[in-house]
Amino acid sequence: LPDGSFDYDGIRAGICEKTKLVTIQRSKGYCPRPTISVDAIGEAIAFCKKLRPDVVIMVDNCYGEFVETLEPTDVGADMIVGSLIKNPGGGLAPIGGYIVGKKDCVENAAFRLTSPGLGREVGASLQVLPSFYQGLFLAPTVTAGALKGAIFAANLYEKLGFKVVPSGDAPRYDIIQAIEFGTPEGLISFCEGIQYAAPVDSFVTPEPWDMPGYDSQVIMAAGAFVSGASIELSADGPIKPPYAVYFQGGLTWQHAKFGILKSLQVLVQKGLVTEEQIRKACRTTLKNTNPVEKAQNKIY
């Protein structure tokens, strides 16, 4: 539902004797709803299992790994899936995804990927396994930096008068920070600032384009070492009301902060935000909220 809760009446009506799999998407995607907490996912799983004990519950865990103490498999999910070029790859994994869960679920997925009987025992490793393991080792620290950046962005833009989801002091269940600008110019300018702060292709200016699968143009900013890695500093959003940007990532807290400040610089240069607004917001944010300490306390 729009408020991030589950439509239990709809779930009850939807699960029938033919239902084999129920999927839950943890993160918000391009929806304005809040991200779903692991506790809320656990309650939904218990509800589904009460209706059909044999139904398989699969959770799309993208952007949520290492944000909370528990993962969906700790609260009853049969399997979780995600991307290695997001949180769990630590910015080092160049490709790949993961499937974690009960043995039979993982085996069935592997058989579907390759062939029955062979499963995950075959396939090229592409000589990237060391990057997978090293990225996984660094992933909690990298995710912590991304969380700090999201909290900083939320507090700063909230003080500037923009609607942010989640708010600066709200609990965090993934690394994504949404900021609603109300105009396409604000959304585009923010993405330009993020791109200009990138370690790769910082000379490029992102522009909206007709991306397949979307009902509006989409703009994306990501000067990343790994193509498509949204655990690196990145931002994107559809060019339609409320003109919200979805900001995430930053391999270090310092780079995330730099990208956010760069986005403000572009907004000032285009006259969308005044320098006095920013000075006032910075003073208020630094006085009332220390996003670094808050994020550290949440994680550690």
What is each residue range found by the language model?
Residues 158-291:
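Conserved C-terminal alpha-helix-loop-beta "cap" of PLP-dependent enzymes
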Residues 1-144, 148, 154-157, 161-165, ...:
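Conserved PLP-enzyme active-site core in the AAT-like
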